[in-house]
Amino acid sequence: IETLPIRDVSQLYDLQSGVVRVESRLQGIPDHEDRGLEEVHVRGGRSGEIAYMIDGMYIRNPIYGGIGNGTRLNKFAIREFDWQPGGFNAEYGDAMSAVSNYHTMSGTNSFAYKFQYETSMLGEALGSRYDEIRDYHDYNIGLGGPIPFFKKIKLWFSGQQTSSGAYQIYEFDNITHNYERDKYFTLNDLNDLRNTDPNWDQVKYSYVAPWDDTEGFKGFGFDNTTDYFAKLTYDITSQLKLTLSYWNVEAHRKGFKTNFLYWNDGQNEIFRDTERKALEFNHTINEKSFYTLRISDFVQDQFIGVRWQDSDND
């Protein structure tokens, strides 16, 4: 997984056969972008027909179902990705299209660490206005190993912090309103100017809407996500193992719609915080028999709306 050309583990679905992952901001289902939902379709099925799991236990948005903003597990926390597009066993309920299961990392007998950083600062340094507005930074870290003085207990910790100064960036033409903001021109005014102004062909494009005052690149919204994962593994005996894991995600996004092209402050914001605690107990009875007990607590809080904004400047 670490060597794949992906920035987010949700892009793993793009690499699977028969899967279409729709970019909500481009051509997705209406309102899915506002809700921060991922659209993953398997062989023509709906996005809500996939069972998403971490270490064999379900995760999903408790209101809309599926996954999306606020349900990101950093890639240094994933040891293996199990994907079953149909034909899965009856043990997997609430799934018609596919089953997705992330097997998480565990600490080993030796200390290990990983670090990765991506940024748009290089493009900005080369003079790219687009990269300057984008202001993209992505940090990935992972480390783990045995806990000192407790050889039977191993720890793994990983985290990812992603920040983008603009959710979407558009390039506008250089035709802007060159007059006072409150000065409007009716169709009759423009017709008179066309007939009387000798320089009409040179200045006619300046008589645009008074709110059209931007030229070049402009960013809208933002997207910030931080998630971290920790896992303790206790090898009680060669036949008994206890695992405790904790996963936390804090996501804050402000998307963009053309309705808010001239008043981005009125666009909805999405706060979505996820917390998952899990306990797993493995007991190997003999060479042919074993059992596993799992319990987890998955909580996802969210706020969608406009906050702390004076929408009419009164």
Question: What kind of region is each of these model predictions?
Answer:
Residues 1-90, 94-99, 119-126, 138-140:
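Periplasmic N-terminal accessory/gating domains of Gram-negative outer-membrane beta-barrel systems
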Residues 6, 47, 78, 105-107, ...:
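Outer-membrane beta-barrel channels and translocator barrels
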Residues 66, 125-129, 213-218, 261-268, ...:
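Extracellular loop and loop/strand-boundary signature of outer-membrane beta-barrel proteins
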Residues 79-88, 96-146, 159, 215-221:
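Short strand-turn segments of transmembrane beta-barrel domains in outer membranes
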Residues 111-115, 153-157, 242-244, 291-295:
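Transmembrane beta-strands of outer-membrane beta-barrel proteins
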Residues 117-123, 161-165, 248-252, 297-301:
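Transmembrane beta-strands of outer-membrane beta-barrel pores
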Residues 132-252, 272-286:
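Transmembrane beta-barrel wall of Gram-negative outer-membrane proteins
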